[in-house]
Each structure stands twice: as structure tokens, then as C-alpha cells.
Amino acid sequence: MSFKKIFVPLDDSELSHRVFSQALELALVDRAQVMLFNCVTINSLGETAVPIPVDLGMNAELMNQAYQAQRLRLESEEKHASGFLKNYCDAAAKQGLQVEFDCKMDGDPGHSICESAQNWGADLIVLGRRGRTGFAEAFLGSVSNYVVHHASCSVFVIQEVKAEK
């Protein structure tokens, strides 16, 4: 089986370095195009970048300050993500691969990954899994689990290596 368009969601973690290396190996086999991707996550309604109406009993100036702080945080995270994605892009380009990157702000990284991969026409998604189980997975969710069950293409999951006790 060969892959022509490999979609690779990354963050700035050690696991993402392994995911990138594995995706690069796969891409080199078939000279596949690569899309590197990051989703800057808006975690909750309290962190949205949308102003909240003053009639909720909140001081307008405080709400504006909170909104501005959130906007600056999101801009900073997007700039940081674009920086490390560009570094990954440069490394892939040195291997002779056709590579690009995209960064989106979204409250749901799993959905954003699936939607962006489908819109790009990916035939493979390579992503990492941190290995949460039980309550941690139920509480915090699992992006990789969501992607495996909702992606419109094949998914290759790289498991995080746990340190031995």
C-alpha cells in the first residue's frame, strides 16, 4: 500500500519528534506530499476569543481585559506553533519532500484534525498517542481515539514510550 498525501498533526512535545520522524520515513518511501498541522486549542467557553455581553453582570472593563489577554495568548500560541512547524517543514524539505504546514484555532483538536485532513485530501494521518487510560482518558478525552474513529482515511498511531519504573 502506498500513500501520496500524509497529514501529520504535531505539537511541541517529545512524542511529536517521534511522530515526525516516522511520518518522514513513510513519506520518503513513496515520495508523498506532507502536511504538518497544529491545532491551537481554545479549552472552554471562558477562554473563547469572542467578547461576552456586559449584561451578564460582569464589569465591561474587566471583560475587555480578559478578552484582550485571551486574544494575546492565542496569538502567542499560534506564533509558537507556526515556528516549530516551520522548523519541521525545513527538515522535511531537506529530505527532498514536498511539505507544507497549517495551524488552526479550534476548541476540538480531534474534529479539526479529521476535517483538515479530509479537506486536504490526505490518504494517511500519522499522529501520536499519549497513552491515557481509564479516568484520565474519560475526563481529558483522547484525540487519537477520536481521529481513529472519525477520520476519512487510514490512521497510523505512534504510542508514547513510557519510562520504566
Segments (PLM) and residue ranges:
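Glycine-rich, Arg-bearing micro-motifs that act as flexible, cationic patches
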Residues: 2, 12, 127-149, 160, ...
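Structural beta-alpha unit
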Residues: 1, 42-43, 75, 79-125, ...
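Solvent-exposed polar/charged
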Residues: 25-28, 118-119, 149
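A short acidic, glycine-rich active-site loop
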Residues: 58-83
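Small/aliphatic-rich secondary-structure junction motif
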Residues: 2-67, 93-95, 100
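Short, hinge-like loop/turn segments at secondary-structure boundaries
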Residues: 51-55, 118-120, 143-144
